[in-house]
Amino acid sequence: ALDAALAAPGIDPRDRGLATELVYGWLRLRGRLEYIVSRLLKNPDAVPVAVGRVLTLAAYEILYCAKVPAYASVDWAVTAVRKRAGKGMAGMANAVLRRIAAAPDAYADPDFYRRDRCEDLEFLSRYYSCPPWIAAMWLRDCGRDEAVAHLAAQTEPPPLGLRVNAARAGALALFDALTGLPQIRLAQFPTLALPAGTDLSPAGVELQDALAEGLLSRQSAAAQVVLARLGMRDWPEPVFDACAGRGGKTLALAEAGKKVFAADMHAGRLSGLGRETARLGLPAIAAFRASATRMALGRAPGTILLDAPCSGLGVLSRRPDAKWRRRPEDLAGLIRLQRAMLEAAYAALAPGGRLVYVTCTVNPAENEQAVDRLGSRHRELVLEAEVPAAPDAALGEAFYGAVLKKP
């Protein structure tokens, strides 16, 4: 919805950038902002939801948007509250936001969120702006240090991930040129991770031209790295990407020289694959609509890549709305779906084939335990490689992956 609204003609690029930062930043830090505002209100429960949203959005702008003067944030927010809830609420909004603007450093101090002698879980939930059930699950499954690393990662925008097209002449030269950019977070051919918000047209390296010419693509660096760590160049061919989505991993495989074909339950997601293969100068990739729970393939592929639907808890920095939409009760249905997909993939493989299971979540029940459950039902399966969903400061996101061989 945001992308569609911002695609309208006539919007100043600066306004488009600010709107994007406000929406994503607010979603990442909503819990922290709501706690700040609640501490400054006499009766938080009496404040209408719409007014609370205005207050927390303005608080984000005051605290985290250095280029916007605090008085401007206070002004538009008070005007918005007056229109929605009258003069009384507007006066309250003015007082609250001026207090925030007067002492912004106070809200950067973790001790502010430890008030009321709260338990550690409540502090972590407040400070890292994460629903308690997610924080509790990570504390239980990962230990405090790793849980805190995951919590911290989801409060920051993810790095800009780029993939150099290894199938094109000049790929190594372009990669070498890009590694000279400042503040590179990761450079592992063909993958680069740059700081979020990196200008794509710096002097000397015309990234926009490289994108247009098919020498370069945007793709999560963490999504690329998990495939590399799982040894994708050694996977038997052809590779069937059974949950291809928009085809990011499909195209990465094709650029690496793999024979690949793709499917997804939602045909619309695959609609841009033809344009992308043309931009990248790749041979056409067969793609069709199909459910990964029923793989009716004419011939068994060498490898089935199952990038399974999951809770997405490893990519909350990129999809911060997910943490507010997800509920603990969602997990059981996802685990059942993953089990059905794994069984279908196992059945579709010929002896000697590989099943590659990938998720973008931090939840052992969807990751290691899903693989263990499949292995307990098919004891002949061999686990050849496994990548845990561990925090990685350079990548800012966490993916799990496993390679299973069917003897």
Model-predicted segments: where are they?
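Glycine-rich S-adenosyl-L-methionine
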Residues: A136, M265-G274, A322-L349
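Conserved class I S-adenosyl-L-methionine
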Residues: W235-C243
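Conserved SAM-binding loop of SAM-dependent methyltransferases across substrates and taxa
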Residues: R246-G257
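Class I SAM-dependent methyltransferase "Motif I" SAM/SAH-binding loop
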Residues: C243-G247, C310
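Class I Rossmann-like S-adenosyl-L-methionine
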Residues: A1-L207
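S-adenosyl-L-methionine
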Residues: H266-G298
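C-terminal catalytic and target-recognition region of SAM-dependent MTase-like enzymes
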Residues: D209, E213, Q219, A290-L305, ...
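Conserved SAM-binding motif I beta-strand of class I
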Residues: K259-D264
